[in-house]
UniProtKB/Swiss-Prot annotation:
Note accompanying the cofactor annotation: Binds 1 zinc ion per subunit.
GO terms classed as biological process: queuosine biosynthetic process
Chain positions recorded as Zn(2+) binding sites: 189, 199, 202, 205
MF terms (GO), sorted A to Z: ATP binding; ligase activity, forming carbon-nitrogen bonds; zinc ion binding
Keyword Zinc: yes
Listed EC numbers: 6.3.4.20
Stated name of the protein: 7-cyano-7-deazaguanine synthase
Secretion signal span: none
Pfam family membership, one: QueC
Gene transcribed to yield this protein: queC
Sorted UniProt keywords: ATP-binding, Ligase, Metal-binding, Nucleotide-binding, Queuosine biosynthesis, Zinc
């Protein structure tokens, strides 16, 4: 029987690449997305298409409305998504504890289906402003996962994989192209419309556009 992995899948470029990488590593992949009240909800439609295209065994979308807490431009309509260029520091698009919340959901599903590997698209190179995308965070969460689960206590080590954490956006795109990822299916924009068309000026769009240019790969993104 093939080993199983839970892959966090937002519908964006990074997580699509990570799903393809997990497949290439020989895993039977289970894709997990979250409807957390993000204003760019069209990314979930993208996630469905990516999961199907890359052959995930299952794709689950969990509802957990983080708009009740606010604190991020992605979940609070009173906060504007920045469009004036990438700044230093933790950006207002940081969703409080989002990766911890999503990895915890993935960890629960992993135990339920006998998976011992979690994959997610943390990246600390092109955009290092998010505290839950750092290598030390990944290592700390893996420690927690093995302390907090039946599988971990019984010696079936759980691994938290962040295969693109030290890659540039161009390197990620080039790797995905080699693995057959159709980036035209993905949505990265923080302000994408209901059709998945990108604004072209938010931080995520700027980084994505620069990545395709640096990679020498045609940008398939649909812009408003």
């Amino acid at each position: 029987m093939k080993k199983r992995a839970i892959v966090l899948l937002s519908g964006g470029l990074d997580s699509a690449t990570v799903l393809a990488m997990a497949n290439a590593d020989g895993f039977e992949t289970y894709a997990l997305s979250m409807r957390y009240g993000q204003r760019h909800s069209s990314e979930l439609e993208a996630a469905k298409k990516v999961a199907a295209a890359l052959g995930a065994v299952r794709h689950e979308i969990v509802d957990l409305d983080l708009r009740k807490f606010g604190g991020s431009a992605l979940t609070d309509d009173a906060l504007d998504v920045p469009t004036d260029g990438v700044q230093s520091g933790i950006p207002i698009t940081y969703v409080p504890a989002r990766n911890t919340i999503m990895l915890s959901l993935a960890l629960g599903w992993a135990e339920a289906v006998g998976a011992r590997d979690l994959f997610f698209g943390a990246n600390a190179v092109d955009y290092s402003g998010y505290p839950d995308c750092r290598p030390e965070y990944v290592a700390a969460y893996e420690t927690l996962a093995n302390l907090a689960t039946k599988a971990g206590v019984e010696g079936e080590r759980i691994r938290v994989n962040a295969p693109i954490i030290n890659m540039t956006k161009a390197e990620i795109i080039q790797a995905g192209v080699r693995l057959g990822v159709d980036y035209g299916l993905t949505v990265s924009c923080y302000k994408a419309d209901d059709a998945g068309r990108a604004c072209g000026v938010c931080d995520s769009c700027r980084i994505r556009k620069a990545g395709f240019e640096a990679a020498g790969v045609p940008d398939p993104t649909r812009y408003v």
